[in-house]
Amino acid sequence: ESYDTTTVRASVPMWLLCKYIKENTKCRYIFSGEGSDEILGGYLYFHHAPSTEEFAYENMRRLHLIHQFDGLRADRCAGAHGLDLIVPFLDKRFIESCMSIDQNLKRDAIEKKILREAFIGYLPHEILWRQKDGMSDAVGTNWVSEVKEYTGTVIDDSLFEEIQTKCKGHNVCLSKEEAYYREQFWLMYGTDQDHLITEIWRPKWTTITDPSARLLIEKTHN
C-alpha cells in the first residue's frame, strides 16, 4: 500500500519473517521495535541537524508520519499472516515520557543513547553499543544493491521519464527503483491514489536522497 522506497525495501524481509513465524512456530504475538527512532531521533541523519530546534521539529515530524512508513509496513506485514503486532515503543505513556525529555540529551551522542543506557546489564556490550543499521541494509549486504540492479533493468530511460511525468509534481521519482515501485502502485491502486503517501522518506540535511543508512555513513566517513 505504498510506493515509498525504504518502506518497500524493509517490507520484503519483514513479510518473509512473518511468513516464517506463521508457518513454523506457534507464536501469534510478536514484539517489534518500531517507533524508537522516530521518538528518540535515532536516524543517522539526525547527527547533521544544524540546531536543537530543527532536531526537535524533525523528531516530532517523523513521529507524526510513522503511520505512512514503518507503522504501515509493520502492521501490514504482520496482519497479512494473522499475527498480532505489539510495539512497546509506541505505547502512549512511553511516547509522552520520551517527547518530554530535553532534546539536547538526544543529540551529540550515539543514536538513542538514552534507550541503550536503559538496557545496560541486559544486552551484550557489542550489541548494545553497535552503530544503528537500517532494516533493509542489515538483512544482507546485497539486498539493496540487487533490487537497484533489477529495477534498473526493467525500467529503461524512456519509461523512467514517462513515469516521472505521470507523477505530476507529487513525489517525483528520483531513481529507477522509485519509478518501479510507483508503477507497481499504479497497477494495483490506480494513478489517483498517489496523495495517500504525502512524501517520500528521505534524510534531511544532506545531499543524499537514497534512504539507505549505509550510504549516509559512507558519505560522512569520506
Which residues does each PLM region occupy?
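Short secondary-structure boundary/capping segments
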Residues: 1, 44-51
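Active-site catalytic pocket residues across diverse enzymes, especially alpha/beta-hydrolases
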Residues: 21, 47, 102
